[in-house]
Amino acid sequence: MAHSRDLKRLVRELLADNGWAARLPELDALPARRLIGPLFSLLLDPDEIVRWRAVAAFGRTVARMAESPPSERGPGEGLEAARVVLRQCLWRLNEESGGVGWGVPEALGETLFRHRRLAMEFHRVLASYVREPECGEGNCLDHVPLRRGVYWALGRLAQAHPDLLENEVPTLLAGLQEADGACRGLTAWTLGILGATAAATAAPALAALLADSAGVALYRDGALEQTTVGTLAAEALQRLAGSPGR
């Protein structure tokens, strides 16, 4: 069995491959607990696309860990082990950890997208990272790149479990007022995904962003695209207009 450094190298080679998505089952053949360390490390990779693919692999791996059948569980497997990994994510976003937590919000969001039970348990704390202190739990992140990651994570969560974000529409509406353009754009993207849940209150605020030319890097459908706040606002409005009950 490969040592940790060798395993990280093997995982990175897979994620850097153009056919990486088709090769993800190769990672499924390995114990999930052994992949967590290498994947945490690869969230810091110099190559942006490798970092995003590490996010995808991280969520897939933790969800697999949570769903491992009792007969196949060893140390570090099962739902509680997956919870421990997500608590590690929360720790890495804590100032007391001494780190910055690059890529951690995205990895957390990808995991919640892939596992309903974990999403039910952790979605509120995820949203709390962009709630302003006066209406949150004191978790609000000041570092702009991390806030971008949280807004992306909320959008990813909304793709699978929009009902869990019904109470977060005010949080997202506040996100449309962020000073950072990428935060505004990612929030607009998320509100569009929520559809009817956000339609009544979000449409006017989104319309106000149609001329916003600030650039946004958005990872979706396995690819990184460069777009603008205005484009994402228009896309969101189109989705809201087509929402049932609208």
Question: PLM ranges: what are they?
Answer:
Residues 1-56, 60-74, 227-244:
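N-terminal alpha-helical scaffold/docking segments in eukaryotic complex subunits
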Residues 2-8, 30-42, 67-90, 116-133, ...:
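Amphipathic alpha-helical scaffolding segments comprising HEAT/armadillo-like alpha-solenoid repeats
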Residues 17, 33, 48-52, 98-99, ...:
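Alpha-helix N-cap/helix-start positions at coil->helix boundaries
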Residues 41-49, 91, 95-99, 174-182:
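Short coil/turn segments at helix-helix junctions and helix-capping linkers
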Residues 59, 63, 109-110, 151, ...:
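Structural signature of alpha-helical solenoid repeat scaffolds
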Residues 102-105, 142-151, 183-186, 226-234:
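Alpha-helical solenoid repeats of the armadillo/HEAT superfamily
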Residues 125-161:
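Histidine/lysine/aspartate-rich catalytic loop segments that bind and position anionic ligands
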Residues 188-246:
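Long, ordered, amphipathic alpha-helical scaffolds
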